[in-house]
Amino acid sequence: MRGYARVVSHPEPRLALLDGGKRDFPYDEGLPVPFGVATALGGEETPLAGASVTALNDQHAFLRSDAPLPVSIGDVVSLGLSHPCTAFDKRRWLPVVEHAGSTRVVDLVRTFF
């Protein structure tokens, strides 16, 4: 399961703030894991090797790395989510994508969590 968040601030070379936090992503079984970054949702992703989400607050994620992050404000970061149950309780509808890695939505599933 993946979530997506935009880069809203890049105040330091090794720190970026994303527009998703505890209200958006599950965190009880681990923080989101960054997979890649693209200039737009569905765009070609550049891997974020060595990057990690180190903290979440209500509405933001803190993306950090030992090396400068290859991100710009407005970029979209894909995140692996640790626990589906606490993702389902945040949404009434979940998109179903065509295949793993795709952003083409082919169906919606209603949740009753």
Predicted feature locations:
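Active-site anion/phosphate-binding pocket segments in diverse small-molecule metabolic enzymes
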Residues: M1-F113
